[in-house]
Design a protein with these regions (language model features):
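Alpha-helix initiation/capping motif
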Residues: 2, 47, 77, 116, ...
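Hydrophobic membrane-insertion alpha-helices, especially the h-region
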Residues: 2-27
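Extracytoplasmic low-complexity, Pro/Thr/Ser/Ala/Gly-rich segments
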Residues: 25-117, 215-280, 284-293, 389-410
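Short, low-complexity intrinsically disordered segments
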Residues: 27, 98, 168, 303, ...
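Generic structural motif
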Residues: 86-88, 109-111, 157-161, 174-180, ...
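Long acidic/polar interaction regions in large eukaryotic complex-forming proteins
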Residues: 110-138
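A short, solvent-exposed beta-edge/loop patch
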Residues: 134-213, 316-410
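Flexible, solvent-exposed loop/hinge segments that line or gate ligand/substrate-binding clefts
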Residues: 261-349
Length: 410
């Protein structure tokens, strides 16, 4: 290279190196600062490197600076931390330039009450779009995958929190921005779903270290599948709703003809099957009954008439409450070892014992639908409870009395 050219080239190369070093230095500083923000907010319990790999984690990260959105175990459990990013803010056009995109949460059991589904709950997409029922995480882990994140549970032998012994702990990793550009086909991206599972598991194990728990969770499975779409015809019921297809209940025009189902997993603290009347069946039943019923609510939204069935297991089964729709009545307990119905709402419960642990099974009917359902609904509840208890090898099954059906306020 001629000497007259060599000098300018060297200068350009040096300038390029300086620019590259400056860019690298700035990116390194931003990464270090982002990690610090996550550690400060989440008490060092949530893996910062995994949060930083989530799709909306670009740009500048900050955290909610308040007692409600930061974790300090000295303040007791449960707690959560909330992380913001400018990338999420730019994508959604927020005035502040940033947006809350991630929540890490944790807690222990025993905890507060579990409340059965409300007869006025909205359990399917009210606009007629697909609903994605939660699914078991799998991989030998007690956990669920939701439409926004992952929740895991870990037994906590020998652990202690707030000066009291605990039986288990839980951790949740959740994405707060689940619309484009941070989604695929209306769901979390495959990448984010896997990262959230890793984050939840690591958070649970870190909390186990702090609390002195003996056990640890294994690594979560890779390539966690997207959630299935529902509801589906009752003729295709599988998993938690397979018993409904096998019993051919949908042949009756008074019973639901669609289901929201999940894969079965006997480890789960809450396993669910939802039976739904499709628009045509709900309208037909309403038209056939409206002249015979006072104040019958017309089902105008998809899935407004439903039967929701849950099984609560272990520690959560010890503190289940039957919902109180109108809020002016104290919710009634659904105690293990018993069975019955709410005196206020169309909610029933049964109980059993599985592997030495209590189980509480609940059934909620949508308001309006409870006015037209025949007493044969007891056969549906019995079939559901039988399926769960036989699958799990349960004993001491207690079911509501026949006189508890159909629902009539006491």
């Amino acid at each position: 290279m001629p000497s007259g050219v060599r000098k300018p080239v060297c200068v350009l190369l040096c300038l390029a190196a300086v620019v590259a070093l400056g860019w690298w230095g700035r990116e390194t500083w931003l990464t270090v600062e982002a990690r610090q923000q996550i550690d400060d907010a989440c008490g060092g319990l949530v893996p910062a490197e995994r949060v930083l790999s989530l799709s909306p984690a670009g740009g500048t990260l900050t955290h909610r600076d308040s007692e409600e959105g930061t974790i300090d175990l000295d303040d007791g459990l449960p707690q959560n931390c909330e992380i913001f990013s400018t990338e999420a803010g730019e994508a959604y056009g927020t005035n502040s330039g940033e947006r809350w995109f991630f929540t890490g949460a944790m807690g222990v059991l025993p905890a507060g009450p579990q409340v059965a589904d409300d007869p006025l709950d909205v359990l399917v997409d009210p606009h007629g779009g697909p609903t994605h029922p939660y699914q078991p995480l799998g991989g030998g882990i007690t956990g669920i995958v939701t439409d926004s994140g992952v929740v895991v549970e870990l037994p906590c032998a020998e652990g202690e929190a707030d000066g009291r012994p605990v039986t288990a702990l839980w951790a949740r990793a959740e994405l707060m921005v689940t619309k484009p550009p941070f989604s695929e086909n209306g769901q979390l991206t495959d990448h984010d779903r896997d990262v959230l599972a890793e984050t939840a598991v690591t958070t649970a194990n870190n909390l186990a270290d702090r609390l002195g728990c003996a056990d640890r969770l294994p690594d979560p499975p890779e390539n966690i599948p997207a959630l299935p779409e529902g509801p589906v015809p009752a003729s295709r019921a599988e998993g938690t709703c397979a018993w409904y297809r096998e019993g051919d209940f949908a042949r009756s025009v008074r019973f639901p003809d669609q289901v929201l189902q999940s894969r079965t997993d006997d480890r789960l603290w809450d396993e669910r099957c939802v039976l739904v009347l499709g628009a045509e069946r709900a309208a037909g039943l309403y038209n056939a009954e409206v002249e015979n019923q006072s104040y019958l609510l017309r089902p105008t939204a998809p899935g407004q008439w439903f039967v929701s069935l849950h099984t609560y297991s272990g520690e959560r089964a010890r503190n289940v409450l039957l919902t109180s729709t109108y809020g002016d009545e104290k919710p009634e307990p659904a105690r293990p070892g018993g069975a019955g119905r709410s005196s206020e709402d169309p909610v029933w419960w049964a109980s059993s014992v599985c592997a030495g642990q209590p189980q509480v099974h609940t059934m909620t009917l949508a308001l309006g639908y409870d006015q037209v359902i025949p007493a044969e609904i007891k056969k549906v509840f019995r079939a559901y409870v039988t399926d769960v208890t036989e699958r799990r090898g349960c004993t001491d099954v207690v079911l509501p009395k026949s006189s508890d059906f159909p629902f009539r306020p006491a």
